[in-house]
């Protein structure tokens, strides 16, 4: 524990976000960087609890109190070593993880939690800047060949671990970019794609082979897969959308998020869609159905494309600002969350059930819905 009184002396201060009036005109990431003093102050707030519940919240089991201690001491390389012992890609999780560790932080019982996610991002960014994160090719090879099907975060992590164990690893990706939803789903304003490309380039230097446009079972048979590799690791992503089977669903103008977001990400990589297939919010009145993170990603993208107005509708009731009694710490808090996209504008509404869409000549004009009331079930 670096500073026993740190949590009493310093408050939670995340990195400052860029002004909304500036950032809605570009796709650059939201946040400014901390100074050394600011970062160390945030690290000092960690209490190094006897039972660190942040470990329970973190799916990776990150050794959070230890890297917070090193950050407070200004020992950034040591902090990085601790972080990399459990997390293959802290530069990803430090940007887009929902941070369940913070929800489980003991400080959050009656105060604001430690800024764990932002500390993680700062450690990894400094690691790359200082040259501490570098290729780690295996010293010996086993002679075994492994195929990893899918190049999202789980596929990349599996490939890195298998390669470091000495196996010859080939990652097969059906899309045109390595990275899965990191490249084609998450908007650039949350995860700059140079961050993903930097990691992929480093993994190539470690000896991992990447192949795009390989769709197993479509243009690459299972027989070929089984015949060419000693082992196969399936890490396919979750790109199958949940549809809304209501009248008018097939009208032109009703789209899945995974039809909309990847197009914009490809545009930023210099690949424009076919004019007949292009989806843009420019000058349009937009409705987003779904109040979660994906909906917020669509909201931020619509702002940047120049939408006239954006409404985001959620079927469930508006969450409370603070934890209700039936949602105690250290459970994940079911509370109202305001993302950077919500700060930028748009209107949110709750208890909205979509009944149908209507339009003229096959083009969407109206959404028809009702307001619902949620009541406890009879017991």
Give the residues covered by each predicted segment:
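Generic structural signal for well-ordered, non-membrane alpha-helical segments
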Residues: 32, 36, 60, 64, ...
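Immediate flanking context of iron-sulfur cluster ligation sites
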Residues: 32-53, 76-100
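Functionally engaged cysteine thiol sites
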Residues: 46-49, 97, 105, 276, ...
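Iron-sulfur cluster-binding cysteine motifs and their immediate structural context
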Residues: 48-73, 94-123, 170, 174-177, ...
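Residues forming the flavin
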Residues: 1-37, 42, 120-379
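Short microdomains enriched in Cys/His and/or Lys/Arg
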Residues: 69-89, 117-136, 141
